[in-house]
Amino acid sequence: TEYYDIIFSSGVYHFIKSEIRKEISANLKEYTNKNGIHAINVFVDKPFVEVPPDKDVNRFRWISGELFMLYHDWKLHKTEEIIFNCNSGGVPHQHCMDIMIAERVK
């Protein structure tokens, strides 16, 4: 089994079903070298941000901070939540995203 120095994921985690998120994250963490980095972002739902018209039917809901909690035992270099404008599909709308950079220190 290979160990990794960096795991980068953008636009992927919102396709992971809630019942297997903890298991997948634990597996990725287990196979990351000491001082390895995970840089991950995930779309999160907010009651005041309308569901985008281009929402993929296979997207699974995440809540604010859920990603960060999966890495509570790692050093968190960055945790940020942003709301940004988007015009995909030709329809102006917004997305909310949690962004994390975490380091395995043990």
Name each model-derived stretch.
Residues T1, I16-E23, N27, I37-K106:
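Class I (Rossmann-like) S-adenosyl-L-methionine-dependent methyltransferase catalytic domain
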Residues T1-I7:
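A short acidic, Gly/Pro-enriched loop at the edge of an enzyme's catalytic core
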Residues S9-V12:
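A short beta-strand submotif of the Rossmann-like class I SAM-dependent methyltransferase core
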Residues T32:
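Acidic, metal-coordinating catalytic segment for phosphate/diphosphate chemistry
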